[in-house]
């Protein structure tokens, strides 16, 4: 109960971590069978200090799918449906983390986002 109270408190106080910004970058289009590589640049917070750094995507029609994360300690967790094609890595010196999705098809058509 104390943990939940603390989490609620942290989310309820305006301004906490409000300067954290995540910005995606990468190619706008990738041809079928190629690999998609995206970068997420984080400012205002060190990716090694805490949190899970996620990739999600939104398909046409607005359906969201969580793809996976890399945690502050470098460990990964992936959506089982993507496990054979996805890799999420990081460069702590640049405070960036990366998505690589192999063998893309038209079913991977989506808008890709990074999030914490």
From Swiss-Prot:
Q: Which domain of life is it from?
A: Eukaryota
Q: List the GO terms this entry assigns under cellular component, sorted alphabetically.
A: extracellular region; immunoglobulin complex; plasma membrane
**Annotated region (Complementarity-determining-1), positions in chain:** 49-53
Q: Name one Pfam family in it.
A: V-set
- Cysteine pairs forming cystine bridges in this chain are 40-114
Span list, region Framework-2: 54-67
Which intervals of the chain are annotated as region Complementarity-determining-2?
A: 68-84
Q: What InterPro entries does the record point to?
A: Ig-like_dom, Ig-like_dom_sf, Ig-like_fold, Ig_V-set, IgHV
In residue numbers, the region (Framework-1) covers 19-48
Q: Which PANTHER family match?
A: IMMUNOGLOBULIN HEAVY CHAIN (PTHR23266)
Protein name, per record: Ig heavy chain V region 3-6
The gene that this protein is the product of is Ighv3-6
């Amino acid at each position: 109960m104390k943990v939940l109270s603390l989490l609620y408190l942290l989310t309820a106080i305006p301004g906490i971590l409000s300067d954290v910004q995540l910005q995606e970058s990468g190619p706008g289009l990738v041809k079928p069978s190629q690999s998609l590589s995206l970068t997420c640049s984080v400012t205002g917070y060190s990716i090694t200090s805490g949190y899970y750094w996620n990739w999600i995507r939104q398909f046409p029609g607005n359906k969201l799918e969580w793809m996976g994360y890399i945690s502050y300690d470098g460990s990964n967790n992936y959506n089982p449906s993507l496990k054979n094609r996805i890799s999420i890595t990081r460069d702590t010196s640049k405070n960036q983390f990366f998505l690589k999705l192999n063998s893309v098809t038209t079913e991977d058509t989506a808008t890709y986002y990074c999030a914490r």
